Structures are given as structure tokens and as C-alpha cells.
Amino acid sequence: MINIAKEHKVNEQIRVRQIRLIGGEGEQIGIIDTRDAMNMAREKGLDLVMVSPQAVPPVCRLLDYGRFRYEQQQNEKENRKRVRSQEVKAIKFRVKIDDHDFKTKTGHVRRFLDDGHKVKVTIMFRGRERTHPELGERILVRVAEALADVGTPEGMPSMMGMDMNMIMAPKQAPAPKKERTEESAEKAGSAGETEPVPAASAAAEAPANV
């Protein structure tokens, strides 16, 4: 597979006299004059794109440059999204948190999960609060229950210093599997509808002649 850089010389920007040309399907055409390659690109409704300027002669390819750039931008977006999904966000709660703050902070966690991030939920203990870890566990249970539709806890809560931590991971709905199950059920139902009725049963159900 040829690696095409973000910046390319395209069509009239290519000033060399000869190039090694690759066709739109990846086939090797060979070394030809750039002018002939340009004519070939016009005839096919494609662009002539230099993909390897350091080669001798430079390597060019026939392709739809606009479509290629669009696909490349989509791939870059997916890569950025994948990198973001590997980031772990952090939201901190106090042991003595009121309902308003709990709702606000839980909303932040929900947004991070919706964006595909993992979230470290931290319960911060003060003074003697540390002697009652069950208070922190209760808050973490509330968080997990409030976000059960979008996230799931990874492992058990753990203590680190004066903090109790729990990782929430985005929840992925098994939609494709459900569709396949429904499709199988429909096929089974269709098969049941076309199953022939045994002759003996049909005769038994038929009304008797008087």
C-alpha cells in the first residue's frame, strides 16, 4: 500500500518531465511522460497525484483527489477519537456531598462517558472520614447506578492515600448481536409458517359431511 502524504503535488503542480505511473486500481503502468499521464487522468475523470517525490523518476498515481482527501480527513477524525477514548478523565466527590453537587458531578461523568472516555471517580476523605470507607463506597454505588445506562465500573474501588477511586468505562450497546438474533427469530418464524400440516391432522380438523 502506498503511503500518500498530507501535502501532495497534484495535476499542473507536477513539473517533472517523466514519472512512474500507477493506475487507479493500483496497477503499474510504467514510466511515461507527465503530459501523457495528465491526458490519461483527464480522460478517466481523475487527478494525477505525486505520491513518492523522492523516487527517480517520481511516482504518481491516478485517483479522485477530492474523494481521497475526504476519506483521509475521516480517518484522521477516527484516529483522534481513538486517542481521546484512551484518555482517562477524573471527577472528584466529597464524602459529604449534597444532592445538587452530586447531580452536577455525575452529569460531568456522563458527558465524558458519552464522548468515549474512561473516567476515574475519586472520593476524597477528610480527617476521621477515612475510618468510614463505607461512606465512600455508598457514593460510588450511587454513581454507578446513576450512570448504569452509559457506563460500567472496571474492577472494585481501591484506596490510595486519602482517596477512594473507581474507574468507569463507556458502555457499548450490543446492537448488532440483537439484530442478528431478531433476524434469526424472523427466519424461524417464517419457517414455522411454511411448515406443511400433516394429512392426518388436516383430515381430523375437516368438518364431517352430514
UniProtKB/Swiss-Prot annotation:
Recorded hits in SUPFAM superfamilies, A to Z, give: Translation initiation factor IF3, C-terminal domain, Translation initiation factor IF3, N-terminal domain
What's one GO BP annotation on this UniProt entry? ribosome disassembly
- Name of the protein: Translation initiation factor IF-3
UniProt keyword list: Cytoplasm, Initiation factor, Protein biosynthesis
The keyword Cytoplasm belongs to this UniProt entry's keyword annotation? yes
Task: Provide the gene name from the record.
Answer: infC
Q: Which family does it belong to?
A: Belongs to the IF-3 family.
* UniProt feature coiled coil, ranges: none
Which GO molecular function annotations are given, in alphabetical order?
Answer: ribosome binding; translation initiation factor activity
GO CC aspect terms: cytosol; membrane
Organism of this sequence = Deinococcus deserti (strain DSM 17065 / CIP 109153 / LMG 22923 / VCD115)
InterPro entries listed in its UniProt record: T_IF-3_C_sf, T_IF-3_N_sf, Translation_initiation_fac3_CS, Translation_initiation_fac_3, Translation_initiation_fac_3_C, Translation_initiation_fac_3_N
Residue ranges under compositional bias (Basic and acidic residues)? 176-186
List localization entries.
Cytoplasm
| Main function | IF-3 binds to the 30S ribosomal subunit and shifts the equilibrium between 70S ribosomes and their 50S and 30S subunits in favor of the free subunits, thus enhancing the availability of 30S subunits on which protein synthesis initiation begins.
* Subunit (UniProt): Monomer.
Stretches for region Disordered: 169-210
Q: Where is the composition biased (Low complexity)?
A: 187-210
